[in-house]
């Protein structure tokens, strides 16, 4: 009887933790869509939801720093994108600093951008409930080792950093990527974290991206994996525990031109059933050679 009581007590303690760990999940994946007549060709690298169907989007190769405003309407039942319209470009400064991330603070009605040049920063996200900005580099910092490639057998170890509303460092956490799945680097190979997305409960979505360009072009592919981590359950000096929510592999070959290099990601509006929309946007390198496309994709997630 004593053993049974102990087991029941352990289960009672663990069950809320298990439920909490499983509270975020992807419940619907919509097909990627393109709106080339409504959107200018771009190197879209970050997106932030402004409310009222409006999204701020940065282009890391735009002539000047700033962001586009796209109005994107969503089917409130399925989460599928219905329409896209371009409301113009908001210039913030002269010249280009390779903007990679963008976030929006609704309480201050302020848009924040971050550039990769000289820093390697790849992402930026902000959450109103936690009052935290999150960012990371695309590849490991020098002190954390060499970047992983298909040839060297290494694993990327990243540092996810969070800042409060005053831009004071509030935490730093180690994150370990999966090992590369490509057998060789091909003509070009990019492997790293392309975006983060902060959620209301303090957890963070991490988008891992592996992009292999074949030597002839045909056979190029891009694999994206969406993980969730919760810094609250991991000591600062330990590697974050992660759970896979979704993965996708797009290709460029004779039969398929679905190749999508997703670099931007943000939480959008709630749907009619209370679930949340997650919007992803791809970097097409200005629709490179007519085969790359400015893909948009939506996932529907539960967050409570």
Task: List where the protein language model places each region.
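Bacterial Sec-dependent N-terminal signal peptides
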Residues: 1-23
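Sequence/structural signature of beta-propeller domains
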Residues: 22-304
């Amino acid at each position: 009887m004593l053993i049974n009581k102990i087991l029941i007590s352990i289960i009672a303690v663990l069950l809320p933790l298990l439920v909490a760990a499983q509270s975020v999940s992807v419940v619907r994946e919509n097909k990627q869509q393109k709106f080339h007549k409504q959107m200018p060709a771009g190197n879209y690298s970050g997106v932030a939801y402004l409310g009222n169907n409006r999204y701020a989007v940065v282009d890391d190769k735009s002539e000047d720093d700033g962001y586009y405003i796209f109005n994107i309407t969503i089917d409130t039942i399925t989460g599928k994108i219905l329409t896209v319209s371009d409301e113009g470009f908001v210039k913030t400064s002269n010249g280009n600093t390779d903007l990679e991330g963008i976030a929006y603070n609704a309480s201050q009605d302020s848009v924040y951008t971050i550039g990769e040049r000289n820093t390697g920063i790849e992402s930026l996200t902000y959450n109103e409930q936690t009052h935290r900005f999150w960012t990371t580099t695309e590849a490991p910092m020098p002190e954390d080792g060499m970047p992983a490639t298909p040839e060297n057998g290494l694993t990327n170890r990243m540092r996810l950093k969070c800042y409060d509303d005053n831009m004071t460092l509030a935490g730093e956490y180690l994150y370990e990527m999966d090992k590369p799945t490509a057998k060789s680097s091909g003509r070009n190979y990019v492997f790293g974290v392309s975006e983060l997305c902060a959620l209301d409960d303090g957890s963070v979505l991490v988008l891992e991206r592996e992009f292999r360009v074949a030597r002839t072009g045909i056979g190029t592919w891009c694999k994206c994996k969406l993980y969730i981590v919760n810094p609250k359950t991991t000591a600062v000096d330990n590697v974050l525990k992660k759970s896979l929510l979704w993965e996708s592999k797009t290709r460029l070959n004779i039969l398929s031109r679905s190749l999508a290099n997703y670099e931007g990601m943000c939480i959008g509006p709630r749907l009619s059933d209370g679930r949340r929309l997650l919007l992803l946007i791809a970097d097409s390198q200005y629709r490179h050679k007519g085969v790359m496309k400015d893909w948009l994709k939506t996932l529907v997630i539960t967050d409570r």
